[in-house]
Amino acid sequence: TRAYAAAAAAGRGLIEPHGGELVNLMIVDEKEKARAIASCDRALELSDRNACDVELLSVGGFSPLRGFMNEDAYEHCVETMRLKGSELLFGLPIVLDTACEDTKVGDRVLLKYQGKDVGVLTVESKWKPNKPKEAKMCYGTSSIEHPGVAMISMERRKYYIGGKIEGLNLPQRPFPCPTPEQVRADLPTGKDVVAFQCRNPVHRAHYELFTRALDAENVGKEAVCLVHPTMGPTQDDDISGLVRYKTYVTLADEVKNPQIRWAYLPYSMHMAGPREAIQHMIIRKNYGCTHFIIGRDMAGSKSSLDGEDFYGAYDAQDMAKANAAELGMQTVPSLNVVYTEEEGYVTADVAKDKGLNVKKLSGTKFRQMLRGGEDIPEWFAFKSVVKVLRENI
């Protein structure tokens, strides 16, 4: 059983999943799948974002959830950042939206994505959400200049429906997204696992950051780092998941660092700052991570109108630190590393104390140089990554 698997994992030195059991909602038997499909009253085509949520529910990335939240669970999570009943921490509500007026409690809904049957939802609850309240409580603002607020206001439809999920088939993606069970099976016994979250290609400063995190005071010897990029829909100006995947594979092959593990997460960012930091920690705990690297502006967002930050630079870090013990995890502060002419990469404090010459290249300037065919300094980006980007964007 899944409970036995979780206990076995804990016995071999892996952190327990959130709630103590790694959920697996996938139906394996083909006859059972056929019966589940035949029992459905209606079908619903999923958005890219919803498909990510169905996948993470089905494979246990959102453990201990076993489906989309019903109205009571949704309200409780929005207001308290906890799951109703167990009172376990949970950063953001997991909901399914629909415009269908006819869907009713008791319906069996076939969930489809890109022509494929991915799951069945048994509707336990249908309601019109208070979206301004959700925005204010979860994102800290009701301004539609915030991408997450714009998403719930304009992309999500009139109703939310909640209920248990049965997984049929995982969405087909052009890159692999190993399940929590698969990632855990590849982790070392009894060692710390430090998670690094990103949604962009990995450049030199990122690599320095997550490799140095393995030397942090609260990280044990022989620890490994799980580089775990989010691969769902991102912001409009972000590089596509497939192109980023190609850069990660190329870099992993180049560095061949035995302390670095790579896996890909079918999660769509909300840019919800502090509450999303908690969500990321819970997900990474389910994937077997004991530590989480968190830096300035984690899951942060700027106004699309005036460029002002919606969150303070350390809001997410403070929220993560305040709740880490309850999650049974530890945070690792993200070092502010800079490149210097004299000593290569050092922390900004060391550079300042020694009066070293710091070299800088903004992300905007990097993209301009990339598109213009200019040489990219090797201190800023890996040649192999630049080559992949040039070939694909």
Listing of model-derived features with the role each one plays in the protein:
Residues 4-393:
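Active-site cores that bind ATP or allylic diphosphates and position pyrophosphate for catalysis
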